[in-house]
Curated annotation (Swiss-Prot):
One of its GO terms (cellular component) is cytosol. It is found in: Cytoplasm. Keywords: Cytoplasm, Elongation factor, GTP-binding, Hydrolase, Magnesium, Metal-binding, Nucleotide-binding, Protein biosynthesis. This is Elongation factor Tu. The keyword Metal-binding applies. Residues 61-65 are annotated as: G2. Monomer. Pfam families: GTP_EFTU, GTP_EFTU_D2, GTP_EFTU_D3. Mg(2+) binds at residue 26. GTP hydrolase that promotes the GTP-dependent binding of aminoacyl-tRNA to the A-site of ribosomes during protein biosynthesis. It is an enzyme of class 3 (hydrolase). It comes from Shouchella clausii (strain KSM-K16). GTP binds at residues 19-26, 82-86, 137-140. One of its GO terms (molecular function) is GTP binding.
Length: 396
């Protein structure tokens, strides 16, 4: 059957759920889709199992992959990512959180903030999630009003500690499970949450007037049609028929024509900043493009290997290193969707960098990545985030 056109009349925002494992992120995601579909008759109610992804990932009792769902309120259309909660899957959290104009931080009222609550707030700050709204979940399990107030204060303090406006952030108390089970008073709390999200998270200022660029998240082949690259358009606009360059990782760049654009399985004439899309590329084989590269308007961005950056090194308490590092330290640098190994050179007079410090450093990557001044990245070793930084100048 022919694909229906995507409705652009409502403003669009990308949000997601973050928080500690088992605090109820996926249940809340299911509850939002269910309550909104029930109230408006629009959108599709998603069951917990449908969001929680592939079976082998659920057997370990944790969500590994990033699930994308869509729903709408009266004023907006949302694309929602359910980010994995477990520390082993921080890598996915980083790719998921990078897709967010705002986040819903889920905290179990019964447990209060936990290590990953802190880690996800930190990650949100580092990957540039500008606004968070808090959902205190499992409030049906807490009878003590004072305890709820205490947990709320604790969450607000934690947000302030990481430069979010803890005093102003909306905090909604509710129960995702009870709402999912259709209990009216708890359904109201979901509506209250979505009203807060509508009002508190501003309509994102899109970079759609800048030149087109999209980090590649995934690549697959469609028999008879060609190769599709998926990702979130970081800036600019892409029209069917445009020429784009595939840049990064490899030394040589490749030009191609975009022969089709789709979003949520619907065809578009064009895509713009903020859209999660699949772009069909003419004459590109599956082997010629990979995650970590970018699609960009020809001549607007170049891959680089050497830059200076301002970096914050996580303290031991934040889950960072326990020991200092020195020049010639070789961690992974996580740009947009991929890790690339790089060598660190510390400025003259700085012998070593302690956990909890911030420092300037020069980085030399082993493969070129499309970066600019202001591009953010994480520093990781063995799958663990140990620092975060921003490119200050490009040297090569």
């Amino acid at each position: 059957m022919a694909k229906e056109k995507f409705d652009r009349s409502k403003t669009h925002a990308n949000i997601g759920t973050i928080g500690h494992v088992d605090h109820g992120k996926t249940t809340l995601t299911a509850a939002i889709t269910t309550v909104l579909a029930k109230r408006s008759g629009k959108g599709q109610a998603m069951a917990y199992d449908a969001i929680d992804g592939a079976p082998e990932e659920r057997e370990r009792g944790i969500t590994i992959s990033t699930a994308h769902v869509e729903y709408e309120t009266d004023s907006r259309h949302y694309a929602h990512v359910d980010c994995p909660g477990h520390a082993d899957y921080v890598k996915n959290m980083i790719t998921g959180a990078a897709q967010m104009d705002g986040g819903i931080l889920v905290v179990s009222a019964a447990d209060g903030p936990m290590p990953q609550t802190r880690e996800h707030i930190l990650l949100s700050r580092n990957v540039g999630v500008p606004y968070l709204v808090v959902f205190l979940n499992k409030c049906d399990m807490v009878d003590d009003e004072e305890l709820l107030e205490l947990v709320e204060m604790e969450v607000r303090d934690l947000l302030s500690e990481y430069d979010f406006p803890g005093d102003d952030v909306p905090v909604i108390q509710g129960s995702a499970l009870k709402a999912l089970q259709g209990e009216a008073e708890w359904e109201e709390k979901i509506i209250e949450l979505m009203n807060a999200v509508d009002e508190y998270i501003p309509t994102p200022e899109r970079d759609k007037d800048k030149p087109f660029m999209m980090p590649v998240e995934d690549v697959f082949s469609i028999t008879g049609r060609g190769t599709v690259a998926t990702g979130r358009v970081e800036r600019g606009q892409l029209n069917v028929g445009d020429t784009v360059e595939i840049l990064g990782i490899n030394e040589e760049k490749k030009s191609t024509t975009v022969t089709g654009v789709e979003m949520f399985r619907k065809l578009l004439d064009y895509a713009e900043a903020g859209d999660n899309i699949g772009a069909l590329l003419r004459g590109v084989s599956r082997e010629e493009i990979q995650r970590g590269q970018v699609l960009a308007k020809p001549g607007t961005i170049t891959p680089h290997t050497k830059f200076t950056a301002e970096v914050y090194v996580l303290s031991k308490d934040e889950g960072g290193r326990h020991t200092p590092f020195f020049s010639n330290y070789r961690p992974q640098f996580y740009f947009r969707t991929t890790d690339v190994t790089g060598v660190v050179h510390l400025p003259e007079g700085t012998e070593m960098v302690m956990p909890g410090d911030n420092t300037e450093m020069t980085v030399e990557l082993i493969a070129p990545i499309a970066i600019e001044e202001g591009t953010r990245f994480s520093i990781r070793e063995g799958g663990r985030t140990v620092g975060s930084g921003v490119v200050s100048t490009i040297t090569e």
